[in-house]
């Protein structure tokens, strides 16, 4: 009986030892798995943070830097503002009752109003003058408030023509024809100059011959 009891005790001890070692190994495996899972989750979260948050932050910084680097837009010159048309609000001009977009009050009769020439919007003189000192566009439609002057083309000028040159008509002639006509005019002038010089030489020779004949006689 004693031997059987000893055998049972040894079996129980070996069982508990095996179960204890199994529990320890399973705990180690569980801790290792959880640790790796946490590391993977942290790396994935950091990847998402770097991809979206940091990228958006850098893009916003670039945008804010470009906005700050742009010079502030100035308003119109005081002389340009003073040159814009003004009038007194009355019944005939159909402006009474129109809302001023700057002060949000209605234009009443006998108020001094100013009209922007490019978009025809009307405001109080004091309101729009204050606006145009810092802005150069209409408060309503953002059209440039400075009047656009039409470009004047210079009138064609005709060069001086000599006394001996005949009048030429260049109407309806293109550039090539005009160039050839000018070259022909120059050659014609040269021919006339040569003929005149040769005629003068002939006349001088005839005069010299006559003088010699008179001296001989």
Swiss-Prot record:
A GO MF term: transferase activity
Location within or outside the cell: Membrane
Gene label: ATL40
InterPro entries: Znf_RING (IPR001841), Znf_RING/FYVE/PHD (IPR013083)
Compositionally skewed regions (Basic and acidic residues) per UniProt: 143-160, 186-217
Family the UniProt entry places it in: Belongs to the RING-type zinc finger family. ATL subfamily.
Membrane topology term: Single-pass membrane protein
Record-listed E.C. numbers: 2.3.2.27
Zinc finger (RING-type): 100-142
Pathway(s) it belongs to: Protein modification; protein ubiquitination
GO biological process, one term: protein ubiquitination
Top-tier EC class: transferase
Database matches in SUPFAM superfamilies: RING/U-box
Catalytically driven reaction(s): S-ubiquitinyl-[E2 ubiquitin-conjugating enzyme]-L-cysteine + [acceptor protein]-L-lysine = [E2 ubiquitin-conjugating enzyme]-L-cysteine + N(6)-ubiquitinyl-[acceptor protein]-L-lysine
Native species: Arabidopsis thaliana
GO cellular component assignments: membrane
Protein name: RING-H2 finger protein ATL40
Keyword Membrane (UniProt): yes
Free-text comment on this protein's domains from its UniProt entry: The RING-type zinc finger domain mediates binding to an E2 ubiquitin-conjugating enzyme.
Keyword Zinc carried by entry: yes
Region (Disordered): 143-217
SS bonds (residue pairs): none
Major localisation: membrane
Keyword entries, A-Z: Membrane, Metal-binding, Transferase, Transmembrane, Transmembrane helix, Ubl conjugation pathway, Zinc, Zinc-finger
Recorded superkingdom: Eukaryota
Membrane-crossing segments per the record: 28-48
């Amino acid at each position: 009986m004693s031997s059987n009891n000893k055998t049972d005790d040894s079996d129980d001890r070996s069982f508990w030892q095996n179960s204890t070692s199994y529990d320890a190994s399973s705990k180690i495996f569980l801790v290792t798995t959880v640790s790796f899972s946490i590391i993977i989750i942290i790396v994935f979260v950091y990847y998402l943070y770097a991809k979206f948050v940091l990228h958006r932050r850098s893009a916003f910084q670039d945008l804010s830097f470009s906005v700050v680097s742009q010079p502030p837009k100035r308003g119109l010159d005081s002389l340009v503002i003073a040159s814009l048309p003004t009038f007194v609000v009355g019944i005939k001009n159909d402006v009474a009752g129109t809302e001023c977009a700057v002060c949000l009050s209605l234009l009443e009769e006998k108020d001094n109003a100013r009209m922007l020439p490019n978009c025809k919007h009307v405001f109080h003189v004091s309101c729009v003058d204050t606006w145009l000192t810092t802005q150069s566009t209409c408060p309503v439609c953002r059209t440039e408030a400075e009047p656009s002057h039409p470009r004047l083309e210079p009138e064609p000028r005709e060069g001086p023509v000599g006394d001996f040159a005949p009048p030429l008509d260049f109407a309806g002639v293109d550039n090539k024809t005009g160039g050839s006509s000018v070259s022909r005019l120059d050659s014609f002038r040269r021919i006339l100059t040569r003929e005149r010089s040769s005629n003068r030489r002939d006349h001088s020779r005839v005069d010299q011959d006559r003088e010699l004949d008179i001296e001989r006689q």
